[in-house]
Regions:
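Active-site beta->alpha N-cap acidic-glycine motif
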Residues: 1-64, 68-82, 86, 171, ...
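A cross-domain feature marking catalytic cores of carbohydrate-active enzymes
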Residues: 3, 29-31, 53-55, 93-95, ...
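Conserved, mostly hydrophobic/aromatic
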Residues: 4, 18, 51-54, 76, ...
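Active-site environment of divalent metal-dependent phosphoester hydrolases
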Residues: 8-10, 35-36, 58-60, 97-101, ...
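C-terminal domain-boundary segment and adjacent tail
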Residues: 20-21, 34-35, 153-195
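Non-membrane alpha-helical structural segments and their capping/turn regions in soluble enzymes
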Residues: 66-71, 129, 152-155
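His/Asp/Glu-enriched short active-site or ligand-binding loop at hydrolase and phosphoryl-transfer sites
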Residues: 87, 97, 103-138, 170-182
Length: 195
């Protein structure tokens, strides 16, 4: 289970509910929102959730110049490093859109891009029950579910989805566990070596 675009005013409530259920998730965060909700980001990390990069401002990378993409990544890395003393190795590129230029940049900064297999369409549906029904229709197991912790309806639907899947004996893991990779590096210079 993954969440993009946060943290937001709804994220702490989501974390509390997930903590009660002992469910770890991966948050792909926007640097500009981490600046607005630093305590929420720290709470997410401290409660065993994984933090990945989404970008700083959610701009479409394919429309940016190379140096602008590096800036989106580096700025977010610096913010996260200052808060949790670590730098993520995972990124979800905004809109999931990549090209050769982006692949090269991600390789240069040692980031693994993570897409999804089930898009909850929560950004479009904006109704708790419709989001829940939509995800349950497409879930097969071993899925990476994309949700957004920036909508109250998404957070409510996420808890319904978690409870239903737990009742069906599903297990939840972070992305780094799922793809068997290291989730963080200790030194920011290890990941931001340019070109």
């Amino acid at each position: 289970l993954t969440f993009d675009n946060g943290p937001s005013k709804y994220t702490s409530s989501l974390i509390e509910q997930l903590k009660k259920r002992e469910i770890p998730v991966t948050f792909f965060v926007l640097g500009e929102n981490v600046e607005k909700f630093p305590d929420t980001l720290k709470f997410a990390y401290d409660t065993g959730n994984e933090i990945g990069i989404h970008s700083y401002t959610h701009k479409l990378f394919t429309k940016l110049k190379e140096e602008e993409i590096y800036e989106q990544i580096e700025k977010t890395n610096t913010i996260l490093n200052n808060l949790i003393d670590k730098v993520p190795t995972l990124i979800r590129v905004p809109y999931g859109t990549r090209d050769e230029k982006i692949d090269k940049i991600l390789s240069n900064v040692h980031l693994t891009d993570v897409l999804w297999s089930v898009d909850s369409k929560d950004w479009k549906l904006k109704n708790t029950n419709r989001i829940y029904q939509y995800v349950m229709k497409y879930i097969k197991g071993n899925d990476i579910i994309l949700m957004h912790d920036t909508f109250k309806t998404s957070v409510e639907a996420a808890i319904l989805i978690v409870d239903k899947l737990l009742s069906e004996c599903y297990t939840f893991v972070t992305i780094s566990e799922y793809i068997d990779t290291k989730e963080y590096v200790e030194n920011i210079s290890d990941i931001t070596t340019l070109k």
